[in-house]
Amino acid sequence: MKIDSIKVFGERHSGTNAIGYFAGKNFNLKFQHYDFLGWKHRLAPKKDEWSKFEIQNCLFIFCMRNPYSWLPAMHKEPYYDHYPKIKDLSLENFVQFSIEDYENCITMWNQKNDSYFRMSEEVPNSIIINIEDFHADQKKFHERLADLLSRQNMPLVKMNDYVNGRGRHEQKDIASSLQVPALEKSSINIINSFLSTETMKKCNYKLLT
C-alpha cells in the first residue's frame, strides 16, 4: 500500500513539529492529528490500541533528543499547566520533580523513548530520528525517507527555521539550542542516577561523566 500520511511521536522539545513538517512538505504526506492515536507527546500506544486504526498507509515517525540538552529545555518550558510553579524550581529540583504520571522527567524520557522503539518494531512503517542528526544532515534524512517511501525523485526542501506548535520562527539559533550545555557535576550525577543506560545506548547517546 502507498503511504500517504504521517503520525509523529516524540517528547516536547524533540523536533516533532520541524521533522513532521519536513516529511509532510517534502513527500506530500498529510498529518494524522489527535483523533488518530492521541497526543503526539504521549507514551506510544500499545498494539491492542493502535491495531484498531487503519495504519497501513501511515508512516510513524519517532523523534528523540539527547537528555542532557532536552532537560534544560523542559526546565525552561515544560508545557505543564497542572503545576505552574514547576518553572520556579532549580534545574536539579526540576529533574527530580514528579511530572504527568512519572516519577520525574528523566524516567519519563526513559519510558517514552523505550515505548517508541517498541512501537517502531511493531508497526509496518516507521522511522526513528534523533533531532540532532536531522539538523546536522537533512539531506541524509531525506534520503532515508525517500528509500522508505520508494520516492527517490522528490526534491529536497530544507527546514532551517525553528518550528513549534504556533508555527515557524526564524530568530531561534537551533544549533546552539541542541548543544549539550555545561552542566554542574552535581546535576550530571542526579541525571545519571535516573537515566537508563540501555535506553541511552538504543538512542545512540553517551552518558556524561
Explain the meaning of each model-derived region.
Residues M1-K47, F53-N57:
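PAPS-dependent sulfotransferase catalytic core
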Residues G20, H142, S196:
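Generic structural marker for isolated residues within well-ordered, non-membrane alpha-helices
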